[in-house]
């Protein structure tokens, strides 16, 4: 009998791999029925990641959004899932244990069924509480392996993590191929090993399409026994996002797998509504480059979603780097050359920093270190001259154990700076904080909310929550949106350089060339002596021989 493979629609990650924001709750309510009508999805990713935080950023209540967004899927029998970052939960920095525990209680009460928990370093210690708290709250605990490609990230390495989290009691394993650089054959072997050792464990694959491996990886993991695959829909599929459900479904069907039918009318409705949301406001924060795939991502291993911020960073330092090169008497470089140098520097720095998987936030740390290294080198300073605080915390083990060994030069630099390596459990460094936040809510006169969901949001995202409550967040967001709309709708002004006619005395010219025959232009306009797309048009040298009938130049006539 053919094996059935189920599909999940990662509607939350589709948006956040493309741009900054997610649809408002009214838009999510609008698209949910069409997603359900498609008929092919067993699961939908509804929240987690930055979903809750960006709702606060545009002045909306994330608790309302999660409850109303998950409800129609429950009524249709579709399971919902969220993404959380282990020690960092729903933010970029460590979270106290009591706040982490409350998160699972709140999210279960709001309607989230499955918690996908990952640690960017694959440190099983950071995942233990995620498994325990998820199961205690009645959620399905799915642990995600942060997939990358390096000499230390072998099948055996990942199975070591799997062994520990299965021991902790997780229900499922996800292969989170966030940069899409996992090699298909390796991923297939990993799934095969998981299924062989733990046949009761559900396996789900999540991959990004940036470098191009993901469809092949999906076929390999399905053949090896994977149960679910994450997919997307147009216009936010492919590029540096996720494979589209249509292609993935047809690929598996042709390979003999049992897959659910897909209602194309409903697909087109989801596609149309998603485009409507883009046109409404979300598109103003979407980088067009994220719709393009790039094999340049294979070597450096950076997630495709980082390309926009990375190019902005490079543009910011481009001038300073060229100034440093000029000072040293060296040739300047253009932005493309700088990008290639950055990719090479990432390849150089990454192993020396202990091969942290290039997933949030560690991909940012490695990228930032590589950029700072480039600036130092091109200004004639030593590499590693500037390492930021967060990267040092990663190096010193305060966020978990690095997969690989640090380079001797990094260890020596830490000792030189008098820094100490942390050997304990990362969670132990962050004491409980809920009593403090309860007291602050009392002082503000704020209610803890249904199922303590307001208390949770305050403790998880204090600054953004305060801005949401005060109205500052919505005011700031609306101002930003107005500015972006004005900029997008402004007419494009093309500035044409004024071409000064060369000054000469016609009488002296005739006297010097008495045999010259003047040519009369057939129309009024601008003389183009040559057609040159790369450089300026230049007049022929005086005295050049011209035969009758030869083309001397061109006239660019005026419009109309």
How would you describe each model-predicted region?
Residues 4-10, 14-16, 41-45, 77-83, ...:
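Structural preference for beta-strand elements that scaffold enzyme active sites
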Residues 14, 117, 165, 173, ...:
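Conserved, mostly hydrophobic/aromatic
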Residues 15, 36-54, 289-297, 301-517, ...:
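Terminal or standalone catalytic/regulatory effector modules within metabolic enzymes
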Residues 33, 42-43, 48-163, 179-180:
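Active-site beta->alpha loop and helix N-cap motifs at the rims of alpha/beta catalytic domains
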Residues 117, 177, 224-243:
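Glycine-rich phosphate-binding active-site loops on the catalytic face of alpha/beta enzymes
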Residues 153-165, 211-227:
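Catalytic cores of alpha/beta
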Residues 237-262:
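C-terminal helical cap(s) of enzyme catalytic domains, especially alpha/beta-barrels
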Residues 505-537, 545, 551-560:
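Short beta-strand-turn/beta-hairpin segments enriched in glycine/proline and small hydrophobics
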């Amino acid at each position: 009998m053919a094996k059935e493979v189920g599909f999940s629609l990662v509607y939350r990650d589709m948006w956040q791999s493309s741009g900054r924001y997610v649809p408002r709750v009214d838009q999510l309510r609008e698209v949910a029925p069409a997603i359900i009508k498609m008929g092919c999805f067993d699961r939908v990713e509804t929240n987690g990641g930055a979903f809750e935080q960006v709702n606060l950023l545009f002045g909306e209540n994330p608790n309302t959004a999660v409850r109303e967004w998950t409800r129609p899927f429950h009524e249709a029998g579709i399971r919902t899932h969220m993404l959380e970052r282990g020690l960092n939960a729903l933010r970029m920095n460590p979270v106290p244990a009591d706040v982490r525990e409350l998160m699972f209680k709140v999210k279960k009460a709001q309607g989230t069924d499955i918690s996908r928990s990952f640690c960017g370093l694959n440190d099983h210690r950071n995942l233990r509480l995620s498994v325990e708290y998820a199961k205690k709250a009645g959620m399905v605990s799915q642990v995600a392996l942060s997939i990358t490609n390096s000499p230390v990230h072998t099948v055996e390495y990942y199975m070591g993590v799997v062994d520990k989290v299965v021991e902790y009691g997780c229900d499922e394993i996800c292969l989170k191929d966030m940069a899409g650089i996992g090699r298909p054959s390796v991923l297939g072997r990993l799934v095969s090993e998981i299924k062989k050792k733990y046949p009761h464990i559900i396996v789900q694959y999540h991959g990004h399409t940036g470098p191009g491996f993901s469809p092949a990886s999906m076929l390999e993991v399905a053949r090896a026994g994977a149960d679910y695959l994450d997919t997307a829909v147009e216009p936010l599929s492919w590029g540096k996002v996720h494979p589209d459900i249509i292609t993935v479904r047809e690929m598996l069907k042709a390979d003999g797998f049992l897959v659910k039918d897909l209602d194309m009318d409903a697909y087109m409705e989801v596609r149309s509504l998603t485009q409507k949301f883009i046109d409404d406001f979300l598109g103003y924060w979407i980088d067009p480059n994220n719709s393009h795939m790039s094999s340049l991502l294979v070597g450096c291993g950076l997630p495709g979603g980082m390309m926009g911020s990375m190019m902005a960073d490079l543009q910011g330092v481009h001038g300073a780097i060229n100034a440093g090169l000029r000072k040293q008497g060296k040739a300047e470089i253009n932005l493309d050359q700088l990008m290639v140098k950055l990719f090479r520097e990432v390849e150089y720095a990454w192993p020396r920093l202990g091969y942290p998987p290039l997933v949030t936030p560690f991909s940012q740390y490695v990228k930032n270190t590589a950029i700072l290294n480039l600036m130092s080198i091109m200004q004639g300073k030593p590499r590693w001259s500037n390492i930021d605080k967060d990267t040092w915390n990663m190096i010193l083990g305060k966020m978990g154990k690095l997969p690989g060994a640090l380079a001797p030069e990094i260890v020596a630099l830490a000792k030189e700076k008098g820094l100490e390596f942390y050997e304990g459990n990362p969670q132990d460094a962050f004491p409980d904080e809920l009593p403090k936040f309860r007291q602050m809510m009392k002082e503000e006169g704020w209610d803890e909310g249904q199922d303590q969901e307001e208390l949770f949001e305050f403790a998880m995202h204090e600054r953004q929550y305060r801005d949401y409550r005060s109205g500052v967040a919505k005011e700031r967001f609306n101002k930003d949106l107005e500015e972006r709309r004005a900029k997008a709708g402004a007419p494009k002004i093309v500035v044409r350089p004024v071409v000064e006619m060369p000054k000469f005395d016609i009488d002296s010219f005739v006297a010097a060339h008495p045999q010259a025959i003047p040519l009369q232009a057939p129309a009024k306009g601008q003389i183009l002596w040559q057609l040159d797309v790369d450089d300026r048009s230049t007049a022929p040298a005086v005295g050049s021989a011209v035969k009758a009938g030869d083309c001397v130049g061109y006239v660019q006539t005026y419009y109309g």
